């Protein structure tokens, strides 16, 4: 039995609320159970120096957690003077996941910066961030379309992410913190709307896992991501 009493293939309650920030070109408040992330997408008429003059744009991401997003206060990374390795890893993952599904040439010489701020953490902050980031990005692209700033189809597909793991010997979908901290294996899957794989991160925490177990986790992830993509489409409709 899972601590949350969910079925092995059951997501936490998920909501994707678009357009929650007044000033941002795109925004989304994403909730995976008790994990809440505020995502904004900002359009900027600037590019990294190495991209200037190439006729295409860029999408990048930043990630951070509020000090009391967790059970005990975490020191702000700004006050420490540097980002943690975990933060750098996650924001790079978010950025490259989004870049796989956007037509950078259609974007023009502009940059969209996606900021993911974790308001409350209960496991799966990176997967919630990626799923909400697509909604914020789509919101920003629609803002641009309404102003005739882009003509071609900028977004080629959806992108969403979910965690899976082996808990008490059973493959389960969408781990919360209680499960993640006790799982024998945990993995994160990032996929497109049509089921193609962008990234797989898998780790054996207590004992190695088999190929069959990995495939079982992937099957759960595909099922969960299909549901998330449906929710994304409803959010931006």
Swiss-Prot record:
- Would the keyword tRNA processing turn up in this protein's UniProt record? yes
Q: Name one GO molecular function term.
A: tRNA binding
Which Gene Ontology terms describe the biological processes this protein takes part in? rRNA catabolic process; rRNA processing; tRNA processing
Cite the EC number.
2.7.7.56
The reactions it catalyses are:
tRNA(n+1) + phosphate = tRNA(n) + a ribonucleoside 5'-diphosphate
Q: Name one Pfam family in it.
A: RNase_PH
Q: Which UniProt keywords apply?
A: Nucleotidyltransferase, RNA-binding, rRNA processing, Transferase, tRNA processing, tRNA-binding
Matching entries from SUPFAM superfamilies are given as: Ribonuclease PH domain 2-like, Ribosomal protein S5 domain 2-like
Tell me if Transferase is a UniProt keyword of this record: yes
What InterPro entries does the record tag this protein with? ExoRNase_PH_dom1, ExoRNase_PH_dom2, ExoRNase_PH_dom2_sf, PNPase/RNase_PH_dom_sf, Ribosomal_Su5_D2-typ_SF, RNase_PH, RNase_PH_bac-type, RNase_PH_CS
Task: State the Gene3D superfamilies in the record.
Answer: GHMP Kinase, N-terminal domain
Q: Where does phosphate bind?
A: 86, 124-126
The protein's job, in short, is: Phosphorolytic 3'-5' exoribonuclease that plays an important role in tRNA 3'-end maturation. Removes nucleotide residues following the 3'-CCA terminus of tRNAs; can also add nucleotides to the ends of RNA molecules by using nucleoside diphosphates as substrates, but this may not be physiologically important. Probably plays a role in initiation of 16S rRNA degradation (leading to ribosome degradation) during starvation.
Oligomeric state and partners? Homohexameric ring arranged as a trimer of dimers.
Family of the protein in this entry: Belongs to the RNase PH family.
Descriptive protein name: Ribonuclease PH
- Organism whose genome encodes this protein: Bradyrhizobium diazoefficiens (strain JCM 10833 / BCRC 13528 / IAM 13628 / NBRC 14792 / USDA 110)
- Gene name on record? rph
